[in-house]
Regions:
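C-terminal catalytic/substrate-binding lobe primarily of soluble NAD(P)-dependent oxidoreductases
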Residues: 1-160
Length: 160
C-alpha cells in the first residue's frame, strides 16, 4: 500500500506542476537483524496471505487473535517504530532520513496518526480540495507539523 500511496502523491504533484522529479523512484524494503527473524517475518506474510485469500482461511483463523484482541497496554506503550529513507538527488548526492516514534505501530502510533490527520482535516485552511488525494498531497505541511508536535520525529541521519 505504501508504494501505491507514494506513487499517487507523486502523480498529484506532477499534475500540479510541483513534481518530485522526472527520475523519481520509490522502493520499499524490510530490514531484519538476522536471517532467522527475516524468515519468521516471511512466514508471517505467507500466513497473512493464506488468511486473506485461500479456502484455508477458516482453518487458520481459529488460531489467530479474534477481532478486538490486540496487544496489552504494556505492549502498546512500550512499542516503537522507525523507518529509514535513502534519498538520492538528481546530482547524485545521497542523504538518509528517518521517521520514528513511540508506541506500538499497529495500534497506538497508527491511532495517533489517524487522529492528527482528522484534526488537520477539520481545522486547517491550507488544504487542497477535490478528488482522491493522499495525506502528503491533501494534508501536506499542516499534517507534518501536527505529527512533529505530537512527538513523531523526522530527521536527517548519518548512515553508512
Amino acid at each position: 500500500a505504501n508504494t501505491r500511496v507514494v506513487r499517487r502523491s507523486s502523480a498529484l504533484y506532477d499534475a500540479d506542476q510541483n513534481s518530485y522529479g522526472s527520475d523519481f523512484i520509490f522502493k520499499e524494503l524490510g530490514s531484519y537483524p538476522s536471517k532467522k527473524s527475516a524468515r519468521i517475518a516471511s512466514l508471517g506474510l505467507i500466513l497473512a496471505f493464506l488468511v486473506i485469500s485461500t479456502p484455508l482461511r477458516h482453518l487458520i483463523r481459529r488460531f489467530l487473535p479474534k477481532p478486538g484482541d490486540g496487544p496489552d497496554k504494556e505492549t502498546r506503550e512500550n512499542g516503537w517504530f522507525k523507518g529509514l529513507f535513502k534519498v538520492e538527488a538528481e546530482d547524485g548526492e545521497i542523504k538518509y532520513f528517518q521517521i520514528y516514534g513511540d508506541g506500538d505501530p499497529g495500534y497506538k502510533a497508527t491511532a495517533q496518526m489517524v487522529c492528527e490527520s482528522a484534526i488537520t482535516l477539520a481545522i486547517s485552511d491550507e488544504l487542497v480540495v477535490g478528488g482522491v488525494l493522499t495525506s502528503a498531497y491533501g494534508l501536506g505541511n499542516p499534517l507534518l507539523d501536527r505529527l512533529i508536535n505530537s512527538g513523531i520525529k523526522f530527521e536527517e541521519v548519518i548512515y553508512n
